[in-house]
């Protein structure tokens, strides 16, 4: 991601910190401060004492990611950090790449730009074929993640719930690996056969990820998990004479290497003997199922199931894979009916650390994935579109995920019931490194809330500060926006129909001062930690419900916690239990923060946060000079949807390869730079690999 991999050697070496027995090199731009040193010490002690569950109760702006990075670096074990959505995952990935520029920080999220699962609607006799668009860049990052886990100890994976969906069996995936060393005895024919078994495609003209080409005694391989590096294998008399990394674009040799491990080009690759065994199992299941439908006199289902399954069996027999191969994953992995599928979690070493960021949201997500998937597949099986074994191609049930959990740290400002019941210890991170304290809370009557809010907004606008307002209904939000606008306030309304990229732009405009007030219904979502916001106004705070529950109120009040003058006004005619608990908790934290500041002579200072897209990635200093040109380019790309951006990436990749074929390497390099920026916008990463481990 970003330019950090390139910048790494220029980092201030004094700020690179290592710990005894740990392979991690932590870039510490500043030492831990506030509650961080104590939180790090307690979490590390908890892990060493063998605690299965711990909770890091970290308030907004207290540097929870930095604490996680310090714990990982001190323990020296591989780690996986779960985030509730792609946007937050990209943000975490960006931050971990900054803290660990010389270690393998990987990104494992769903690789679908668009996904329509196969489904059947019996009422209308309508079958919907599976339709999807796979994002090749994210697929490459997923393959890179599993490779790093199998090869290195200094690995951190940032993942979403995609990690609990089935992928290939790690043991069989490992069996398929091809390790090449200089001096190895192996024939060219055997190398080619192994590559084809790993689902690499031979392509002499269009050399891209997951392909290889043969020229005389030389085989060029473009590994599926690499974005910008290929391997040249030179052979002589059935012996590996030399191995080299080279640039697939320019053909320039980068370095000679003593060995290289080629990993399969898909997580679903399976050894030939396993496929043949699976085919027999599928045939046996098909016979049983057809017999069942015959007894029921359901001849349409008989014909449907037989036709579809026989076609898939033919493809498996000839090619080793078929469309929808994941529906036969139980037979391919040799699992028993009802057994959990292999997932990314199975690739983790037994001593890995797990962090569940925003755990109060994530636990609910992990709980809900199985049921939705099951309901859709049951209909497909019932009407003869799939064999019953397709039900075992599924995400993990929550209790299965729980059994596979390693030592876990829940990270949240407002832990939910599950964390409270399971935490071996709760580590508080309430004091911020900046000395900022939680907002002052004021309760005012709801009857005059709109007029009072207008006068409060005017005070903030005069001081050059921003305001967030949360309402209960869409209609109220629209009416309030209209009222404020008529009274000369620069206001925008943030609603659920706005997509992620546009949402980021709105937040950016608020920070830049294009407008002063943001009205929304749910202000709990990511990316709303804005230092310029000094007032959060909660309308109708006494109406009990999800958005006015204790946890939601604490989260919303915390949106003003990054400003020295942070204030939260709760408009209510009575104080509910949820309000009382939220106010008491905020006051408790505030008292603790103020006592710490007084004891240590700390003056609170506001957060200075550079204004950039939260999924921009990281810029190096040289990029600032080209800011104007980059801004023009970004403006064009920002108007595109995620699907359009994916098409633009494919167009640029083709253009880059065309330039390379015409030996116009300077032009090809320029297009590659453009591609890196575009990928940074879409994925929060430029697609560069983690630094190579020493060979």
From Swiss-Prot:
Citing just one GO molecular function, the answer is: excinuclease ABC activity
Assigned GO CC terms: cytoplasm; excinuclease repair complex
> Helicase ATP-binding domain spans which residues?
45-434
Task: Please report, in chain numbering, the residue ranges of the motif Beta-hairpin.
Answer: 111-134
Helicase C-terminal domain: residues covered = 449-602
Per UniProt, the keywords (alphabetical) are: ATP-binding, Cytoplasm, DNA damage, DNA excision, DNA repair, Excision nuclease, Nucleotide-binding, SOS response
The record's subcellular locations are: Cytoplasm
Q: What region holds the UVR domain?
A: 646-681
Task: Identify the residues that bind ATP.
Answer: 58-65
The set of disulfide-linked cysteines is none
**GO biological process terms on file:** nucleotide-excision repair; SOS response
What Pfam families does the record point to? Helicase_C (PF00271), ResIII (PF04851), UVR (PF02151), UvrB (PF12344), UvrB_inter (PF17757)
Name the Gene3D superfamilies on file: 6.10.140.240, P-loop containing nucleotide triphosphate hydrolases (3.40.50.300), UVR domain (4.10.860.10)
Give the domain note.
Answer: The beta-hairpin motif is involved in DNA binding.
State the function annotated in the UniProt record. The UvrABC repair system catalyzes the recognition and processing of DNA lesions. A damage recognition complex composed of 2 UvrA and 2 UvrB subunits scans DNA for abnormalities. Upon binding of the UvrA(2)B(2) complex to a putative damaged site, the DNA wraps around one UvrB monomer. DNA wrap is dependent on ATP binding by UvrB and probably causes local melting of the DNA helix, facilitating insertion of UvrB beta-hairpin between the DNA strands. Then UvrB probes one DNA strand for the presence of a lesion.
Family as reported in the entry's similarity comment: Belongs to the UvrB family.
State how it assembles: Forms a heterotetramer with UvrA during the search for lesions. Interacts with UvrC in an incision complex.
Q: This protein is called what?
A: UvrABC system protein B
Q: Which gene encodes it?
A: uvrB
């Amino acid at each position: 991601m970003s330019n950090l991999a390139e910048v790494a050697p220029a980092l201030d070496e004094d700020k690179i910190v290592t710990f005894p027995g740990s392979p991690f090199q932590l870039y510490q731009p500043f030492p831990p401060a506030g509650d961080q040193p104590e939180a790090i010490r307690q979490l590390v002690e908890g892990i060493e004492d063998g605690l299965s569950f711990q909770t890091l109760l970290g308030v907004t702006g207290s540097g929870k990611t930095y604490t996680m990075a310090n714990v990982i670096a001190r323990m020296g074990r591989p780690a996986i950090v779960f985030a509730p959505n792609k946007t937050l995952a990209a943000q975490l990935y960006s931050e971990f790449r900054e803290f660990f520029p010389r270690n393998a920080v990987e990104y494992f999220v769903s690789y679908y730009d668009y996904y329509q699962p196969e489904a059947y609607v019996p009422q209308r006799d309508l079958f919907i074929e599976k339709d999807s668009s796979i994002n090749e860049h994210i697929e490459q990052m997923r393959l890179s993640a599993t490779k790093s886990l199998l090869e290195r100890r200094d690995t951190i994976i940032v993942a979403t719930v995609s990690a609990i969906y089935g992928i290939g069996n790690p043991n069989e995936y490992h069996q398929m690996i091809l390790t090449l060393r200089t001096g190895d005895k192996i024939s060219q024919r055997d190398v080619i056969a192994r590559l084809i078994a790993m689902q690499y495609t031979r392509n002499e003209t269009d050399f891209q990820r997951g392909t290889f080409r043969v020229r005389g005694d030389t085989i060029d391989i473009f590994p599926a998990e690499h974005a910008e590096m290929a391997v040249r294998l030179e052979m002589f008399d059935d012996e590996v004479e030399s191995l080299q990394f080279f640039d697939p674009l320019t053909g320039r040799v980068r370095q000679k290497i003593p060995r290289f491990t080629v990993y399969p080009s898909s997580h679903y690759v399976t050894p030939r003997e396993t496929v043949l065994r699976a085919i027999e199992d599928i045939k046996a299941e098909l016979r049983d199922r057809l017999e069942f439908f015959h007894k029921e006199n359901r001849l349409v289902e008989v014909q449907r199931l037989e036709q579809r399954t026989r076609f898939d069996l033919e493809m498996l027999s000839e090619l080793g894979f078929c469309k929808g191969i994941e529906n036969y994953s139980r037979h391919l992995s040799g699992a028993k009916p009802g057994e959990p599928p292999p997932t990314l979690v199975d690739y983790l070493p037994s001593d890995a650390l797990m962090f569940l960021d925003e755990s109060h949201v994530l636990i609910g997500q992990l709980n809900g994935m199985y049921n939705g998937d099951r309901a859709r597949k049951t209909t497909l099986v019932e009407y003869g579109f799939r064999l019953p074994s397709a039900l075992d191609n599924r995400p993990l049930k929550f209790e299965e995920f729980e059994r596979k959990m390693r030592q876990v740290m829940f990270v949240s400002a407002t832990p939910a019931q599950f964390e409270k019941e399971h935490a071996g210890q709760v580590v508080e991170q309430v004091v911020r490194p900046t000395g900022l304290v939680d907002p002052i809370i004021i309760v005012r009557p709801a009857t005059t809330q709109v007029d009072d809010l207008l006068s409060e907004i005017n005070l903030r606008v005069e001081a050059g500060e921003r305001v967030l307002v949360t309402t209960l209904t869409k209609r109220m939000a629209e009416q309030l926006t209209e009222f404020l606008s008529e009274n000369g306030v620069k206001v925008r309304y943030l609603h659920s129909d706005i997509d992620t990229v546009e949402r980021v732009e709105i937040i950016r405009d608020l920070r830049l001062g294009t407008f002063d007030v943001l009205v929304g219904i749910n202000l709990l979502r990511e990316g709303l930690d804005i230092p310029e916001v000094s007032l959060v106004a909660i309308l109708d705070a006494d109406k009990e419900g999800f958005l006015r529950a204790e946890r939601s109120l604490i989260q919303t009040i915390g949106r003003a916690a990054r400003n020295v003058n942070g204030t939260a006004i709760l408009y209510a005619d009575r104080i509910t239990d949820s309000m009382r608990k939220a106010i008491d908790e905020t006051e408790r934290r505030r008292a603790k923060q103020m006592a710490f500041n007084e004891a240590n002579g700390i003056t609170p200072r506001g957060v200075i946060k550079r204004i950039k897209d939260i999924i921009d990635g990281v810029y190096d200093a040289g990029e600032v000079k080209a800011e104007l040109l980059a801004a023009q380019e970004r403006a064009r790309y920002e108007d595109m949807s995620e699907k359009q951006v994916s098409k633009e990436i494919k167009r640029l990749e083709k253009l880059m390869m065309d330039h390379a074929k015409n030996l116009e390497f300077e032009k090809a390099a320029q297009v590659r730079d453009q591609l890196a920026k575009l990928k940074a916008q879409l994925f929060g990463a430029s697609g560069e690999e983690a630094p190579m481990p020493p060979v």
